[in-house]
């Protein structure tokens, strides 16, 4: 969103590139509305008042396009051999595409690795707070791992060089859904975006002050989402424990006094 830069350029009387003229005109109409509320001065001061041209188009002065790998280490997941059952257990999440659907944060996974399984591919461990992107078959799902984990080979993960890159990268990857699909369409029936292609995707790099402020503003939202996700995981676990016992008759509602109390109160 270049609106703060356009605002600054308009106020400073700086020229707007022809390619951005239509956006500037729309922005000016918004600014002329009676109920227009400008961004706080301290936020606008983080943005430049000029644009500069790059090979990939116009960007705010001081910003640039760079390969995704320059934001952090890219790790392609791997599946430990199934022939060694000791590699699987309950110590580490082993994230696969079904675990990512509808999740901003992944807090649980259907399969898990043991400590031994993790150690068998220690170079594939994904530190918590990384951005996981599905790149084979179902392409373009984006999630954040809530704890150190592993993924299978259908997922590439970005380990941010700095914690304040995380939230920006999450939204940036969501916006690249169509780009991911275009890059993964190689003529075969199955979509496949390999790690090399993924690592070199051009990604807009704002200045560091903007990235830090963006993280500061958005982090409370992410913290609330993560807390809710843990609550949902806990409730799902409780459901999966109690429901079979209720269906089989091993338990009845009378055996759950807290539930009865809550129901009566409602």
For the regions a language model picked out, list residue spans one by one.
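Non-catalytic DNA-recognition/assembly elements of restriction-modification systems
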Residues: 41-78, 210-213, 219-255
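A generic structural signal for residues embedded in beta-strands
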Residues: 133-134
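Low-complexity, Lys/Gly-biased intrinsically disordered segments
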Residues: 20, 29, 36-39, 44, ...
């Amino acid at each position: 969103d270049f609106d703060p830069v356009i605002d600054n350029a308009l106020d400073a009387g700086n020229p707007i590139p022809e390619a951005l003229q239509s956006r500037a005109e729309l922005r000016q109409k918004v600014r002329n509305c009676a109920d227009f509320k400008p961004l706080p001065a301290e936020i606008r001061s983080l943005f430049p008042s000029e644009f500069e041209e790059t090979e990939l188009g116009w960007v705010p002065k001081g910003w640039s396009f760079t390969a995704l790998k320059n934001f952090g280490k890219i790790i392609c997941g791997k599946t430990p051999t199934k022939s060694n059952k000791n590699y699987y257990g309950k110590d580490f999440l082993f994230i696969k595409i079904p675990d990512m659907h509808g999740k901003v944060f992944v807090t649980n996974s259907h399969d898990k690795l043991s400590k031994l399984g993790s150690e068998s591919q220690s170079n594939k461990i994904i530190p918590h707070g990384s951005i996981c992107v599905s790149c084979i078959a179902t392409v373009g799902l984006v999630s954040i791992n809530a704890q150190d984990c592993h993924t299978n080979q259908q997922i590439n993960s970005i380990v941010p060089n700095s914690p304040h890159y995380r939230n920006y990268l999450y939204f940036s990857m969501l916006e690249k859904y169509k780009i991911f699909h275009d890059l993964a369409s190689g003529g075969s029936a199955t979509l496949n975006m390999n790690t090399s292609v993924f690592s070199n995707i051009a990604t807009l790099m704002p200045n560091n002050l903007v990235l830090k402020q963006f993280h500061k503003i958005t982090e409370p939202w992410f913290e609330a989402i993560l807390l809710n996700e843990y609550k949902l995981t806990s409730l799902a676990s409780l459901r999966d424990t109690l429901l079979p016992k209720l269906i089989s008759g091993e338990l009845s509602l009378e055996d759950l006094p807290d539930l009865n109390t809550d129901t009566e109160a409602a």
